[in-house]
């Protein structure tokens, strides 16, 4: 499982021109782009959610848990692109939608159980993500 975490001052995700999830924190928040591979499960999702929630990448070495920073979760199968051969990425390392969708939901649910305010995109939809990256700070987490 991979989560590309970006520290943001705002982020929103739209489907068909309609905003389906948005965060506009008073300070900082996190955008989490979540990729799932074949051997991932809800337990890994919970472990990665805990790691991200406690990750000290906000101002003054604070974590989202420390300040109650909101989180926007967006599924992102392209995090498992294989570009070693040719010019066209291969997606065989990404879990199929039927496997990945409940794991992405488990990740968001685990964050909520930790106390996070979570907004989310729509799994499998063509989404437009708008964000204002702060820093910029972008970190790849992987289990």
UniProtKB/Swiss-Prot annotation:
Keywords in alphabetical order: Cytoplasm, Hydrolase, RNA-binding, tRNA-binding
Reaction(s) catalysed by this chain, per the record, are: glycyl-tRNA(Ala) + H2O = tRNA(Ala) + glycine + H(+); a D-aminoacyl-tRNA + H2O = a tRNA + a D-alpha-amino acid + H(+)
Q: Enumerate the GO terms in the molecular function aspect.
A: D-tyrosyl-tRNA(Tyr) deacylase activity; Gly-tRNA(Ala) deacylase activity; Ser(Gly)-tRNA(Ala) hydrolase activity; tRNA binding
Look up the domain of life of the source: Bacteria
Q: Does the keyword Iron apply?
A: no
EC number(s)? 3.1.1.96
GO BP term (any one): D-amino acid catabolic process
Task: Provide the protein's localization.
Answer: Cytoplasm
CDD domains of this UniProt entry? Dtyr_deacylase
The GO cellular component terms are: cytoplasm
Motif range (Gly-cisPro motif, important for rejection of L-amino acids): 135-136
According to its UniProt record, this protein's enzyme class is: hydrolase
Listed Pfam families: Tyr_Deacylase
Q: Which family does it belong to?
A: Belongs to the DTD family.
Which PANTHER family does the protein's record reference? D-AMINOACYL-TRNA DEACYLASE 1, D-TYROSYL-TRNA TYR DEACYLASE
Cross-referenced NCBIfam families, in alphabetical order? D-aminoacyl-tRNA deacylase (TIGR00256)
Functional summary from the UniProt entry: An aminoacyl-tRNA editing enzyme that deacylates mischarged D-aminoacyl-tRNAs. Also deacylates mischarged glycyl-tRNA(Ala), protecting cells against glycine mischarging by AlaRS. Acts via tRNA-based rather than protein-based catalysis; rejects L-amino acids rather than detecting D-amino acids in the active site. By recycling D-aminoacyl-tRNA to D-amino acids and free tRNA molecules, this enzyme counteracts the toxicity associated with the formation of D-aminoacyl-tRNA entities in vivo and helps enforce protein L-homochirality.
How does the record describe its quaternary structure?
A: Homodimer.
What does the UniProt entry state concerning the protein's domains? A Gly-cisPro motif from one monomer fits into the active site of the other monomer to allow specific chiral rejection of L-amino acids.
What protein name is recorded for this chain? Answer: D-aminoacyl-tRNA deacylase
Q: Which organism is it from?
A: Mycobacteroides abscessus (strain ATCC 19977 / DSM 44196 / CCUG 20993 / CIP 104536 / JCM 13569 / NCTC 13031 / TMC 1543 / L948) (Mycobacterium abscessus)
Its taxonomic path starts at: Bacteria, Bacillati, Actinomycetota, Actinomycetes, Mycobacteriales
Gene name for this UniProt entry: dtd
């Amino acid at each position: 499982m991979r989560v590309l975490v970006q520290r943001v001052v705002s982020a929103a995700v739209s489907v068909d021109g309609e905003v389906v999830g948005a965060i506009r924190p008073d300070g900082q928040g996190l955008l989490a782009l979540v990729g799932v591979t074949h051997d991932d499960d809800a337990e890994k999702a919970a472990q990665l959610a805990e790691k991200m929630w406690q990750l000290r990448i906000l101002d003054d070495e604070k974590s989202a848990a420390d300040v109650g920073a909101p989180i926007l979760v967006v599924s992102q199968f392209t995090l498992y692109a294989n570009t070693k051969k040719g010019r066209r990425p291969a997606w065989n390392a990404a879990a199929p939608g039927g496997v990945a969708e409940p794991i992405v939901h488990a990740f968001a649910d685990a964050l909520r159980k930790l106390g996070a305010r979570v907004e989310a995109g729509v799994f499998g939809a063509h989404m437009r993500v708008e964000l204002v990256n702060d820093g910029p700070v972008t970190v790849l987490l992987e289990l």
